[in-house]
């Protein structure tokens, strides 16, 4: 690398650091905002900041819900985000059931999910639950949509969507009848999601600096 190119890259890394320093400061401010009873604003901004980082990291994929779930599962810092809530998955697949390829298999899937234990499941457990009732192609079709039933997807639905398109998310979504590894499922609240935001900022900073490219790709498609 020439000296000019090296200097340009060094300047770029400094710019990346400055950008994420600013993002980190914004995230830190949200806690202060929350403490001063501007809780709706704190939750809305927290949801939007994660949305922005997810869109940037997952570019060029433009599926907001998928990207939001993906970044929480990969970088949210809690294994629970990848676990599946059977009722949530059933509700999500019900929205797809009018499509021709789902009309035949959804009733079978729904019956099995409705009688599942009131706990969060790992992906392989849901596969084992459904496998005896579907052929290989049908099972793969369903597996690709498992993300819609994850705990991360519940955060998207109950926190992000409520914040951006409603009147603000509730201050704590609880799961009184559902367990995770034998214990109560933690409530989805500002502090959980804010912790995710802080971790995601750190991860996306590292990806950008280590690759020398914004969010690992500089918003350029590989050739």
Kindly give the residue locations of the regions a language model identified.
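Short non-catalytic regulatory patches outside canonical folded cores
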Residues: 52-140
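Generic structural signal for well-ordered, non-membrane alpha-helices
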Residues: 24-28, 48-51, 158-161, 165
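Surface-exposed polar/charged interaction patches
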Residues: 33-36, 74-78, 95, 99, ...
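Short, hydrophobic, well-ordered secondary-structure elements
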Residues: 27, 31-61
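Alpha-helical structural motif
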Residues: 26, 64-68, 155-156
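Residues that form generic nucleotide/phosphate-binding pockets
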Residues: 22, 71-75, 203
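Short N-terminal edge-element motif at the start of the domain
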Residues: 13-34
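Polyanionic, low-complexity intrinsically disordered segments
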Residues: 2-18, 39, 100-223
């Amino acid at each position: 690398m020439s000296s000019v190119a090296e200097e340009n890259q060094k300047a770029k890394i400094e710019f990346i650091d400055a950008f994420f320093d600013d993002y980190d400061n914004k995230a830190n401010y949200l806690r202060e905002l929350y403490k001063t009873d501007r809780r709706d604003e704190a939750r809305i901004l927290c949801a939007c900041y994660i949305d922005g980082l997810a869109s940037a990291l997952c570019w060029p994929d433009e599926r907001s819900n998928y990207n939001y779930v993906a970044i929480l599962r990969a970088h949210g810092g809690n294994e629970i985000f990848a676990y599946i809530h059977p009722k949530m998955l059933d509700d999500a697949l019900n929205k797809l059931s009018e499509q021709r390829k789902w009309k035949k298999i959804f009733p079978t899937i729904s019956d099995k999910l409705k009688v599942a234990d009131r706990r969060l499941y790992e992906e392989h457990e849901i596969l084992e639950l459904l496998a005896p009732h579907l052929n290989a192609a049908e099972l793969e079709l369903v597996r690709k949509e498992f993300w819609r039933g994850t705990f991360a997807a519940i955060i998207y639905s109950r926190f992000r969507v409520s914040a951006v398109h409603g009147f603000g998310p509730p201050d704590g979504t609880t799961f009184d009848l559902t367990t995770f590894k034998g214990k109560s499922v933690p409530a989805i609240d500002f502090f959980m999601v804010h912790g995710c935001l802080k971790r995601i900022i750190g991860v996306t900073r590292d990806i950008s600096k280590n690759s020398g490219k914004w969010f690992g790709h500089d918003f350029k498609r590989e050739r």
